Every structure is written in C-alpha cells, then in structure tokens.
C-alpha cells in the first residue's frame, strides 16, 4: 500500500460526589449544555486524562474518549465532581470503521460544535501487525486515525470558531522522536521493522500533516503540535518491547503527565500565544510552553504536501 513517494528520495531525518456524566444515546441527538466543548482522545489515563479533567474543572464540557465504553465511563467517574459536563465516548481507533464510529458519536453528542479537539490517543506495539485496512497498527493509530478524525469533525470545529471570532483549535500530540524517523513509503511498513522506528515514523508523518493542515486552514481553525517530552505514564508499559524498558529505566527522569497537560490546556483555552502551525514544547513550570523547531524533514514543504495528499487518498478524497 504505497503512499506515492516512489519518485522522491526521503532518507533518514535526524468522600466522593458523582460527576455529571452524560451517557451516549445512540438513537437520539445529545446536545451538550456547556458553552465551551472539547473532545480529548485517549482520555482514560496519562496526559489525556489530565487534560480532560483540567478542562472540566474550568467548566468545559469534555467528551472523554476511551477504547471501550467501560473505560471511558470509568475515566469520567475518576475525574470527580467538576463544574463542566463529562460525556464518555468510545471507539477503537485502529480502523477506519472505528474512526467513523467516533465521528458519528461526537456529531450526536455535540451538534452545536466543538471548540477544541485534542488528538492525544496514541499507540506503540512490540511486533509488526496490520489492521483490517492493511495498515501497520502504529501508523494507523498515530497518524491515519488522527487525520480521519480531524477531517470528520471539521464541520463541527468550523462553525464554533466563526461564531466566536476566535478559531477553534486542534491540538496534535507529537514526539521529539520524529527527528530520528525514516519517512514512510508504504502505510503497511513492509520489510525491516522496529518498534521505535515505526513509532517515530508515524509521528513524523503526523507532524508533517499537521503543518500542511495548518497551512490549508490558516486562521479559520488553529492547528498546533505539542511535544510533551518524556512523560511517566502507562504508555511505555502497555507498549512492551524497547519502550517498556526505556520506561522502566528512565522513569526517574521523566515528568508527570500534569506538566504537558498544563501546556495543552493553556494552548486550548488562552488567547493564542502561538500562531497556528506552531510546534510547542512542554516546559517545566511554564504553562504555555515554548516554540522549538521540529526536524528539518517535518518542515519541508514538499514532504508536507506529499504526506497530506497521500493521507487524503487513503481517507478517500
């Protein structure tokens, strides 16, 4: 499943009060009551959980995404008694059908629109495997699902931004490992495969796509990439392989999820401190983070266009 780079040379690039939880009704539209609404994917633990809880504490209505309905409901319950509303939504984002399921749920849950989409869900695996769509699993979750979800929710993001004269915001969680990635030639990642290589390449592709999307949407919808740095979460453990070992050995040097969550929340809620298309690095004790250039490859306009075009072809349009 090539992605159309065959004519290009892209080498290596350096007590408890019950919270206000709204259950999804799959038959009737569910209107959210809050004036400010966000979807946070991967919100059952780690950075996503911290972001969702922080936004809800600010009075936002938060759509809390998990891979299963049970996990999403449990995460919303753990967020506690918050001023905002909590709406559990669920989908497995490895497949296009899973992405469509989440898009449909969000359209029913928030028909009046979203202010913010936080694409936090991510994955890594200890062995090569393909989804039912023929895509390597890491690439499917970390890039193609993000692109498909963002595209499927564009119509919700657009009206809110225009009505408030302040663009809606899409926040992509990236990784500094993108700087060590090989550009993807085939969504299936055939041939030699490593866990770290697949993860880095998926993040490079998504970052390039992020830049391309920011250019196309310009001031209509603001798009940001946030690099959380090395964070102590259950991600490494669940990934297995080298990432699990790195998580065990590096845990004392890693930050808590709350640090990058502060940066994400600041990016989502404060007057724009960064132009759309910014790569923002989470910095200790500085909520708004700071701009830091990403890899040369990710900033190459030709590469961005090719990733965008290849992604659109996969998504169907």
Pin down the residues of each PLM region:
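Catalytic loop of short-chain dehydrogenase/reductase
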Residues: 29, 122, 126-130, 136, ...
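C-terminal helical subdomain
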Residues: 248-291, 301-305, 309, 313
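A glycine-rich helix->loop->beta "capping" turn
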Residues: 83-84, 105-119, 125-130
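Canonical Rossmann dinucleotide-binding motif of NAD(H)/NADP(H)-dependent dehydrogenases/reductases
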Residues: 27-63
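Rossmann-fold cofactor-recognition segment
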Residues: 81-97
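Conserved glycine-rich Rossmann-like NAD(P)H-binding loop of the short-chain dehydrogenase/reductase
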Residues: 58-74
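Active-site Tyr-X3-Lys motif and surrounding loop/helix of classical short-chain dehydrogenase/reductase
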Residues: 101, 105-108, 133-140
